[in-house]
Amino acid sequence: MGIKGLTKLLADNAPKAMKEQKFESYFGRRIAVDASMSIYQFLIVVGRTGMETLTNEAGEVTSHLQGMFNRTIRLLEAGIKPVYVFDGKPPDLKKQELAKRYSKREDATKELTEAVEEGDKDAIEKFSKRTVKVTKQHNEECKRLLRLMGVPVVEAPCEAEAECAALCINDMVYAVASEDMDSLTFGAPRFLRHLMDPSSKKIPVMEFEVAKVLEELELTMDQFIDLCILSGCDYCDSIKGIGGQTALKLIRQHGSIESILENINKDRYQIPEDWPYQEARRLFKEPNVTLDIPELKWNAPDEEGLVEFLVKENGFNQDRVTKAIEKIKFAKNKSSQGRLESFFKPVVSTSVPLKRKDTSEKPTKAVANKKTKGAGGKKK
């Protein structure tokens, strides 16, 4: 979920902290990517029509591999150096949110069964997406694919978003790419949305700068964290009746959640029982992260390994995989120049004014009605 309604809140109250950028603006930049969020998007969009998805001969879904392969190649071709960060063990405080998600998937599964019995195609499309879950197997297969492509993988001890933010704070990467807005709450200096968008539409990258967010909102980082907790985060319930705008007003007026609780009208607003907002705050301020990771290197692709994994094991088209490998090799040679050219010629800003229509909080829900080009395997 990330932070409920934060994109709209920033668009309304801190528009200068947001700017649209072209994909190519990040040539030579190291970008930490929230892998699980990307895999989830690929499973929903790539090669999916109703309940049909891309599979290999064993009937195992390959949409995540197809999406990860194609999108990573596009990043490399643009001169971007992706670092994929995978989730570790979730914090205990997130168990309640994970239980809610499980319950919603169970409900969606029941609704899907009814839709299939009734032959309701729109409902099938709707509820089949809600049953999607990123599994350990999906993660492990994507790690294997990325390593074969020569792309670095980081395994976070806990939350991937927190690890991405830590890498960015410590100048190990330029920015963080995800769809979850809590990357900002973890303090990522630069945060990118839509970089990993898997739809066929060319959606501009939305870049946020946390320093400008704080400046525009006139808040400290501690106050911004409290604002996010009040708005609604993954770690605890929020106070019913308090949305983003009200939360911002209260934080500006009182300065902290503690002060708000002392002054709030408790007849109007019901405080959750044993509300663990302090622990949620601690998880944002002191997340379980590590900087003790192998040196980030972008190596030549393992050509034989990629053919073995994608073609022989997962039914991808060999000619397309071979051509894709050539793209990876060409992109590596191109990006090896880094951003050297930018030191010798002026760079024109590619940012464009913010368009409110692109401030949706949800991941892209576009449906791939046409067969994905270069798709591996078949549909089931």
Swiss-Prot record:
GO terms for biological process: base-excision repair; DNA replication, removal of RNA primer. Inhibited by NaCl. Binds 2 magnesium ions per subunit. They probably participate in the reaction catalyzed by the enzyme. May bind an additional third magnesium ion after substrate binding. Pfam families: XPG_I, XPG_N. The keyword DNA repair applies. Residues 355-364 have a biased composition (Basic and acidic residues). Residues 336-344 are annotated as: Interaction with PCNA. It comes from the Eukaryota. It is found in: Nucleus, Nucleolus; Nucleus, Nucleoplasm; Mitochondrion. Keywords: DNA damage, DNA repair, DNA replication, Endonuclease, Exonuclease, Hydrolase, Magnesium, Metal-binding, Mitochondrion, Nuclease, Nucleus, Phosphoprotein. It is an enzyme of class 3 (hydrolase). CDD domains: H3TH_FEN1-Euk (cd09907), PIN_FEN1 (cd09867). Residues 368-380 have a biased composition (Basic residues). Phosphorylated. Phosphorylation upon DNA damage induces relocalization to the nuclear plasma. The keyword Cell membrane does not apply. Its cofactor is Mg(2+). GO terms for cellular component: mitochondrion; nucleolus; nucleoplasm. Its main location: nucleus. GO terms for molecular function: 5'-3' exonuclease activity; 5'-flap endonuclease activity; DNA binding; magnesium ion binding. Residues 351-380 are annotated as: Disordered. Mg(2+) 2 binds at residues 180, 182, 234. InterPro entries: 5-3_exonuclease (IPR002421), 5-3_exonuclease_C_sf (IPR036279), Flap_endonuc (IPR023426), HhH2 (IPR008918), PIN-like_dom_sf (IPR029060), XPG-I_dom (IPR006086), XPG/Rad2 (IPR006084), XPG_CS (IPR019974). Its EC number is 3.1.-.-. Interacts with PCNA. Three molecules of FEN1 bind to one PCNA trimer with each molecule binding to one PCNA monomer. PCNA stimulates the nuclease activity without altering cleavage specificity. Structure-specific nuclease with 5'-flap endonuclease and 5'-3' exonuclease activities involved in DNA replication and repair. During DNA replication, cleaves the 5'-overhanging flap structure that is generated by displacement synthesis when DNA polymerase encounters the 5'-end of a downstream Okazaki fragment. It enters the flap from the 5'-end and then tracks to cleave the flap base, leaving a nick for ligation. Also involved in the long patch base excision repair (LP-BER) pathway, by cleaving within the apurinic/apyrimidinic (AP) site-terminated flap. This is Flap endonuclease 1-A. The gene is FEN1A.
